[in-house]
Design a protein with these regions (language model features):
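Accessory, non-ATPase domains that flank or precede helicase/AAA+ motor cores in DNA-metabolism machines
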Residues: 1-309, 333-336, 358, 450, ...
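C-terminal helicase module of SF1/SF2 nucleic-acid helicases/translocases
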Residues: 34-37, 280, 325, 329-333, ...
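Short hinge/gating elements
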Residues: 62-72, 313, 392-399, 463-470, ...
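C-terminal boundary of histidine-terminating zinc-finger modules
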Residues: 307-331
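Cys/His-rich short segments
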Residues: 322, 327, 332-416
């Protein structure tokens, strides 16, 4: 019996997430290979699909023939298997994931002869990793010292991997990071070995780059989140930098996180995985508890020798002001040496609540989630929707909103330092990549800090309560990540001043240079609340009737449903060791509802914005 093509049809409908058999016309037989795009007639319409395999069919009727084969194979078996695992991990469909793994076809760039292979680099000096004790294999969760260069370190790991005969994929959050990492790698090896995968590139460039990676001429891939799917030959190293940045989460269905995809892929091909940042996430702290990752950070001796100075202060209640006198002193002293960085949160309405008595962020007494005013102005948890009645720290009942912006900060600082240049770097005024080393005050929002040769002479972090009072499960983790990113652009001798209560765990972690303990504290608190990463969580969103109908078909642990401004929301929870059953049930219910034509319910697994509203 002649082979048939088993095709995954591109469709958003969950009940069509399976393979369909199509006959192969003789004229297409030589071209109809696994990994090829095809056009097929499906339910009376011409649609796109992918040949996943060829083989015999169990169907005894007449099959629809393939209509067209669109180009050469561009989907490898390894990436195909990865897409299936990611779909199952995020309760999505195979083709929903596949669209991120392979760029759209541009026929004009096909058929070009492969480039001659670039010269294999010599083994590079890995001495920068020596104080960290990086293992030669397995999974590593890495806390980088803020005054080390993580891009040089990752570049060296990648080039060393290629020198040993392997390939490498390096994933970073944004285009600025891509440029820095590309420069670091290109300084160590032939740039022709390197491919850049970025959403900023045109589709023509992205498709040409994909073909170059496929033919093996590009051994190191650098890019933003979708680069994690790049079909690198002999993949031996995957690295994800700054995994706490939520831009590593794909906003479209099914909402995968590049860190989790990297972990699935590293397990699948037995590649080494390095996940790092200036801080550690609760997710990778969970890997340490599970025994699946190595703890990579400076040795105790090296950390003692290279302490970075972080201080915290809060003015006495009677003299409380937004920029305390001691903070002005830090700025004044820093200006004698060079530019000073002032980090402020983005402007806007109140993003959370703090205690009017002691300034501690208000958090839910039931689940630990952030609290913010609801539509009626009542202090309500955005995670479990309980009302908050008292500050957990001092018992006071009066709460105040928090919120501030870079423009107001710049105006205050200009009044205090009229002879000093004030530079803003933010989304409103424009983000600067670099400035020179002349004395100036740079007011920047998180992620917009320009770099300066030699680093800033001082750092002042204002309005810390805004980040800490965010109504998100990850508020403390995110605050530490943003503040440490600012510390990383200071000089070795700089002082960092946080205007924040000194007894807050996140502040103490920075003061003590101990980000590992903070990550473990976050992990433990979330485990007690049955929240990720110790538990898998699925968030359902839809109309009230659709969510209620969906839940009627489900028998596991549920929080909710609760009414929201847009309809209804519920959370499904499961211990991780039983999560595969929950996710399978979610896929089954979604498929059943799709087949029956029921109203859609949005599904998100382990959403990073849990608790926000």
């Amino acid at each position: 019996m002649a082979d048939v093509a088993k095709v995954a049809v591109e469709s958003p409908l969950p009940h069509l997430d399976r393979l369909f058999d199509f006959s192969i016309p003789e004229a297409l037989d030589a071209d109809a290979l696994p990994g090829c795009r095809v056009r097929v007639r499906f339910h009376g319409r011409l649609v796109n699909g992918w040949i996943i395999e060829r083989g015999p069919t169990e169907f005894d009727g007449a099959l629809q023939p393939l209509q067209r084969v669109s180009g050469p194979p561009v989907l490898t078996d390894e990436v195909l298997g990865l897409c299936r695992r990611v779909a199952d991990r995020y309760a999505g469909t195979f083709t929903d994931v596949l669209r991120f793994a392979v760029p759209s076809r541009v026929a004009a760039v096909e058929g070009r002869p492969p480039q001659p292979p670039a010269s294999t680099p010599a083994a590079t000096d890995m001495g920068v990793w020596a104080p960290y004790g990086l293992p030669d294999q397995g999974v590593s969760t890495w806390i980088c010292h803020p005054h080390d260069d993580p891009f040089d370190m990752l570049a060296r790991a990648a080039v060393d991997t290629v020198a040993r005969g392997g390939g490498a994929v390096l994933v970073v959050p944004d285009a600025r990071d891509v440029r820095r990492l590309h420069a670091a790698v290109s300084a160590l090896c032939d740039p022709e070995l390197v491919a850049v995968v970025s959403a900023e590139a045109s589709n023509r460039v992205r498709y040409r780059t994909h073909l170059q990676i496929l033919d093996g001429s590009r051994r190191i891939v650098i890019g933003t989140r979708s680069a994690v799917f790049a079909p690198v030959t002999d993949l031996a190293l995957i690295a994800v930098w700054d995994d706490g940045d939520d831009v590593l989460v794909e906003p479209q269905t099914p909402g995968w996180h590049a860190r989790e995809v990297a972990a699935l892929r590293a397990w699948q091909v037995r590649a080494r995985l390095i996940v790092g940042g200036y801080t550690r996430t609760a997710a990778t702290a969970q890997w340490l508890v599970d025994g699946t990752a190595a703890d990579v950070r400076l040795s105790r001796e090296a950390a003692r020798e290279r302490r970075y100075r972080v201080d915290a202060l809060v003015e006495p209640d009677a003299d409380r002001r937004r920029i305390p006198a001691r903070a002005f002193a830090v700025v004044r002293s820093g200006l004698e040496q060079g530019p000073v960085l002032v980090q402020v949160p983005r402007a806007g309405a109140a993003t959370g609540l703090i205690c009017a008595q002691c300034s501690h962020p208000i958090r839910c007494s039931r689940c630990g989630g952030g609290v913010r005013p609801d539509r009626a102005g009542r202090p309500r948890c955005r995670l479990c929707h309980e009302l908050a009645h008292a500050c957990a720290s001092c018992g006071a009942h009066d709460f105040v909103g928090v919120g501030a912006g870079s423009r107001r900060s710049a105006e205050e600082l200009q009044k205090a330092f009229p002879a000093v240049a004030i530079i803003r770097s933010d989304a409103d005024s424009g983000v600067l990549d670099t400035i020179d080393a002349r004395p100036a005050i740079v007011v920047a929002t998180p992620g917009s800090e320009p770099r300066v040769p030699g680093g800033y002479a001082a750092l002042l972090v204002l309005d810390t309560d805004v980040l800490l009072a965010r109504s998100a499960l990850r508020a403390r983790e995110e605050a530490a990540r943003r503040w440490m990113a600012a510390v990383a652009v200071t000089s070795d001798e700089a002082t960092t001043m946080l205007v924040a209560p000194q007894d807050l765990p996140v502040v103490q972690a920075l003061v003590r240079n101990d980000l590992a303990s903070l990550a473990e504290m976050d992990r433990q608190e979330r485990a007690q609340a049955h929240m990720p990463p110790a538990f898998r969580c699925v968030r359902l969103r839809g109309t009230s009737s659709a969510v209620s109908e969906w839940l009627a078909a489900y028998s596991g642990e549920v929080l909710g449903p609760l009414e929201t401004t847009d309809g209804s929301e519920a959370l499904l929870l499961s211990p991780r060791d039983r999560a595969s059953g929950m996710l399978h049930d979610v896929q089954r219910i979604q498929a059943d509802r799709s087949k029956a034509g029921r109203p859609p319910v949005e599904v998100r697994v382990d959403p990073v914005d849990l608790g926000e509203g």
